[in-house]
């Protein structure tokens, strides 16, 4: 069984731990977080406002360990990823979920002994051997030379498979997409200056992002195209993206239009989608039910294609809507690629 260590025990780190309680594919033996309150970490693992309480799993603290159903997870409190004794813990794969660039820069230094791979849960501009997305560019992955791997971002994981399929089957000449993304912890509850927006490593320019996150749709720049380029280099010349932060807590959506090179029909698009879901199970899901965003809470797919809004206009303009759980769905993508990288 593959052994995992998690650096950064925030939303993604805890989601990965909960997902493993469901699937039981790996052993999580170590987590590292700069917050020294181990009881608080255990509390947040057990009680989650978004995903609910762990009702059938026993979570307790014993010294420097969190015990989940009797299985121990040792908790470290190091500020840098290189200071954690991953090798001593027998870790095969370290998941870098802190979001701190310095940890990405140090990732190659911990590839030794038992540690074979580091997965970075965002899309940094440096320190990465390969940006991996199953069903998109996974056939280009080289196990012998790619050791520090980016799992990209939630938005790119949602759009990437759909874009790849449509571009392969019909050709995408140009695309306009808008992401609708729930608020994040660095945003303000009440109006404030940009300096009050707590997001280390980011320099925001638009005053609108300092406004209250719970009362309005907030237009915002997005890193989607930059992240897509790292996985699909040619996509940068075809796609333009914008974003809204929405006054909701979970589940994102992408509303988009592709101008196609090849004329097609809705039946041909639907068939291509069905074939893709069979070739790459678990990546895209097709759904024609009358659902709303919260109904996709806890969905593990990279994205759900809402067939109600899939439309071909005059043969070459494809309208689409995708849904994705920006926390659980993305964490599930990270979780399931671990075994594909070893």
Model-identified regions with their sequence ranges:
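Short acidic (Asp/Glu) and glycine-rich catalytic loops that position anionic groups and cofactors
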Residues: 205-209, 249-254
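N-terminal Rossmann-like NAD(P) cofactor-binding subdomain of oxidoreductases
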Residues: 1-210, 336
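Acidic-histidine catalytic/liganding microenvironments
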Residues: 23-25, 169, 232, 280, ...
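Conserved active-site and cofactor/substrate-binding residues in soluble primary-metabolism enzymes
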Residues: 7, 11, 89, 105, ...
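Glycine-rich beta-alpha junction loops
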Residues: 34-36, 124-125, 153-155, 179-187, ...
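Small/polar-rich, solvent-exposed N-terminal microdomains that initiate assembly or binding
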Residues: 205, 211-220, 285
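A structural supersecondary motif
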Residues: 230-244
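C-terminal active-site/capping subdomain that shapes the small-molecule cofactor and substrate pocket
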Residues: 240-246, 253-342
């Amino acid at each position: 069984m593959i052994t995992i260590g998690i650096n950064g025990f925030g939303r993604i780190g805890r989601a990965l731990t909960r997902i493993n309680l469901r699937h039981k594919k790996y052993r999580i033996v170590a987590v590292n977080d700069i917050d020294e309150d181990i009881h608080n970490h255990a509390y947040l693992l057990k009680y989650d406002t978004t995903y609910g309480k762990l009702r059938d799993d026993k979570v307790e603290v014993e010294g420097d360990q969190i015990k989940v159903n009797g299985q121990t997870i040792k908790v470290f409190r190091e500020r840098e990823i290189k200071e954690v004794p991953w090798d001593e813990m027998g870790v095969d794969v370290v998941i870098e979920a802190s979001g701190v660039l310095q940890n990405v820069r140090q990732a190659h230094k911990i590839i030794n002994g038992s540690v074979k791979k580091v997965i970075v849960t965002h899309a940094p501009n440096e320190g990465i051997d390969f940006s991996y997305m199953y069903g998109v560019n996974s056939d280009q992955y080289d196990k012998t030379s790619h050791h520090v791997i980016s799992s990209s971002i939630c938005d790119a994981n949602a759009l990437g498979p759909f874009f790849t399929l449509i571009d392969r089957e019909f050709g995408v000449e140009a695309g306009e997409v808008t992401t609708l993304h729930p608020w994040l912890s660095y945003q303000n509850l009440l109006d404030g200056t940009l300096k009050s927006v707590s997001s280390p490593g980011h320099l925001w320019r638009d005053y609108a992002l300092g406004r209250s996150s719970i009362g309005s749709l907030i237009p915002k720049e997005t890193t989607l195209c930059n992240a897509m380029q790292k996985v699909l280099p040619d996509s940068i010349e075809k796609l333009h993206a914008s974003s809204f932060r929405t006054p909701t807590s979970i589940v994102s959506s992408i509303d988009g239009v592709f101008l196609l090179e090849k004329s097609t029909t809705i039946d041909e698009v639907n068939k291509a989608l069905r074939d893709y879901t069979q070739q790459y199970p678990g990546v895209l899901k097709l759904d024609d039910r009358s659902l709303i965003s919260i109904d996709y809470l806890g969905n593990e797919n990279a994205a759900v294609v809402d067939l109600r809004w899939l439309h071909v206009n005059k043969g070459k303009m494809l309208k689409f809507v995708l849904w994705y759980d920006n926390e659980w769905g993305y964490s599930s993508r990270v979780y399931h690629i671990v075994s594909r990288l070893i």
